[in-house]
């Protein structure tokens, strides 16, 4: 669901699960600052109080929603670093609670990672569904280890880049919230295909071209890293 439409439709659709992946400076001409988008998502969640909300523990903005809604909440995220140092692009350098500068125990990408505020104590929550290891990061996909509650498993992911590993964790978190067999859900991750314009591969003569969608500075950083 489009982040701008969630507040309009969630009360009517009455979803069982709402997944919020991350917040970046995306389409500022439509939504303004990321805090405006966050408020819109919060309103959408409040309109569906029976929905279980799956939040990205690595995103300080997304994770903050847990304290603002009465819904049952589950977290997903990466328990392993993906970048040695802080990225040059950060949409959330300061604490959403007190305004202090975040520090990080490790970084995944952009402003995502093991954040904590030394001033007020707001910090990354422990995820219910966690990536505990990255066995392989390939141009065409990856292999990762997951902890889903008490269950440990490994899965192949057919889409490349770290952010798709995070998306896989989100999918497994949602599957668990819906009461689906998580191991069976993990087996399907290797069969996911790219959507139109998102890591789509097109034949160009004797070569292949990959289309990488870029909508914000963080996405551009990931595209250049790829």
Language-model-detected regions and their locations in the chain:
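Gly/charged, well-structured mid-domain segments that form the phosphate/adenylate-handling core
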Residues: 139, 174-210, 214
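Conserved mixed alpha/beta catalytic, RNA-binding, or beta-rich assembly cores of soluble enzyme
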Residues: 216-219
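Flexible active-site lid/hinge loop adjacent to a nucleotide/diphosphate
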Residues: 3-110
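Residue-level detection of beta-strand-connecting loop/turn positions
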Residues: 32, 148-152, 206
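Cys/His-rich short segments
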Residues: 78-141, 145, 158
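A conserved, hydrophobic alpha-helical segment in the catalytic core
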Residues: 13-22, 112-126, 159-190
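Extended interfacial segments that mediate partner engagement and assembly in macromolecular machines
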Residues: 141, 149-152, 156-163, 169
